[in-house]
Swiss-Prot record:
Name of protein: 6,7-dimethyl-8-ribityllumazine synthase
Active site per UniProt: 87
A Pfam family it matches: DMRL_synthase
GO BP annotation list: riboflavin biosynthetic process
Gene of this entry: ribH
Class in the EC hierarchy, top level: transferase
Organism: Bacillus cereus (strain B4264)
């Protein structure tokens, strides 16, 4: 038997957690995610967005959303750009571990849509220019995974 997720979002309720730090990028990721959800049939009234200060704060609110029982999937969006210190490494590692841990603990998909880039240019490319919009891609993944995970509910 082959299991596949559908790309029709009708009837799904989705939570989105967005880091405000680097908002000029994260707002584009959010725009892409909202576009992806709506294009695939998720009603605007079925999408809740929570803004948090930065990427490091994403896992806590994602956990609260995922454990609320209100959502079929949670999308996490943020942007961490390497600077001159090791802060980048700590933030990237902890956010990735936090979201990955939630994906395994919760009964719903928690999608990792946090950009971890070396440069501002790379972040811009992934927020809607050369490399597509990772927010949009995260939305499509959330829809597919929500349907796929329900096959074992």
């Amino acid at each position: 038997m082959v299991f596949e997720g559908h790309l029709v979002g009708t009837g799904l309720k989705v939570g989105v957690v967005v880091g405000r730090f680097n908002e000029f990028i994260t707002s584009k990721l959010l725009g892409g995610a909202l576009d992806g959800l709506k294009r695939h049939g998720v009603e605007e009234s079925d999408i809740d967005v929570a803004w948090v200060p930065g990427a490091f704060e994403i896992p806590l609110i994602a956990k609260k959303m995922a454990s609320s029982g209100k959502y079929d999937a949670v999308i996490t969006l943020g942007t961490v750009i390497r600077g001159a210190t090791t802060h980048y490494d700590y933030v990237c590692n902890e956010v990735a571990k936090g979201v990955a841990s939630l994906s395994l603990q919760m009964d719903i998909p928690v999608i990792f849509g946090v950009l971890t880039t070396e440069t501002i240019e790379q972040a811009i490319e992934r927020a809607g220019t050369k490399a597509g919009n990772k927010g949009y891609e995260s939305a499509v993944a959330a829809i597919e995974m929500a349907h796929l995970s329900k096959q074992w509910a």
